[in-house]
Amino acid sequence: MKIIHTADWHLGKILNGKQLLEDQAYILDMFVEKMKEEEPDIIVIAGDLYDTTYPSKDAIMLLEQAIGKLNLELRIPIIMISGNHDGKERLNYGASWFEHNQLFIRTDFTSINSPIEINGVNFYTLPYATVSEMKHYFEDDTIETHQQGITRCIETIAPEIDEDAVNILISHLTVQGGKTSDSERPLTIGTVESVQKGVFDIFDYVMLGHLHHPFSIEDDKIKYSGSLLQYSFSEAGQAKGYRRLTINDGIINDVFIPLKPLRQLEIISGEYNDVINEKVHVKNKDNYLHFKLKNMSHITDPMMSLKQIYPNTLALTNETFNYNEENNAIEISEKDDMSIIEMFYKHITDKELSDIQSKKIKNILENELRKED
């Protein structure tokens, strides 16, 4: 049996004001073409199909087109669950009709009680749920963390699980120790959101969404597929794609398959003048770029100048702000007022105070000292 594991499409994502629908349409077309080659028995999408609870019309159309090609044209069964970004009601609309074509949409965490059996494999679905939802459902005020809530959900099905079959869990959550990125919205506020690996011991394999790095966690049977695209500059350089899972005689193997996007996220560090004069290596001018530059404080609008050469510049950082990060041994308390001002001015402008500026500042400081006396 061959299973494809994907997640975190985040359709409708806007990165630093840039709409990514073109990039998402490109990567989904590539994914569909890959599925024609793979001919899987089933595709699993582990949450966060959309980036917002209220996706745009274009984002909805993009999902419909991709799912239509995969499920209706290629006749591939699909299981999809909701993530913390998805609007459950919108994603679940028409779910009962779609099951006639083996498109299984699960948005309620209680669906874990109703596994989907395909080719002798039991797929248990555990969509994203808040701690309060689980606490209310179980009428248990002692549930205060995701660890406690998820444990309770799995305990409810443990007595019924068929130990002679292959049992796979599909969920959207954070496993303890998983590597996070800036584009992942925290699952909870004020409670512990990560879940320990041991909670999943009764399953033969666990397919997860939420964390965007495909190797967020090192484990033989607990895997994240990662997102289809890089969605924050903290993900620059990360491979993106999907996982192929094969089951032969009860033995499970998986491999990560990378996909090449239309554009990647790239971080460029250097001197402003070198970048403007194109003396700094950029992999692809069409990539989405974050420049971290020095010596640009004298430039009125550096972002505009950069975009004339690199149209997809999405972020710009003045590296002088990090001037002392590697030299934080300097104790400000040991400096006099004038020295602190000189350091600050140099830190911000990368220039020394002029004689006139120094004299004016000294006069101001002296006047303030007289007032204190």
From Swiss-Prot:
UniProt entry keywords in alphabetical sequence: DNA recombination, DNA replication, Endonuclease, Exonuclease, Hydrolase, Nuclease
SUPFAM superfamilies reported for this sequence: Metallo-dependent phosphatases
UniProt keyword Nuclease, yes or no: yes
One GO MF term attached to the UniProt entry: endonuclease activity
GO BP: DNA recombination; DNA replication
Similarity section: Belongs to the SbcD family.
Known role: SbcCD cleaves DNA hairpin structures. These structures can inhibit DNA replication and are intermediates in certain DNA recombination reactions. The complex acts as a 3'->5' double strand exonuclease that can open hairpins. It also has a 5' single-strand endonuclease activity.
Subunit structure: Heterodimer of SbcC and SbcD.
Listed name of the protein: Nuclease SbcCD subunit D
Organism the protein comes from: Staphylococcus aureus (strain Mu50 / ATCC 700699)
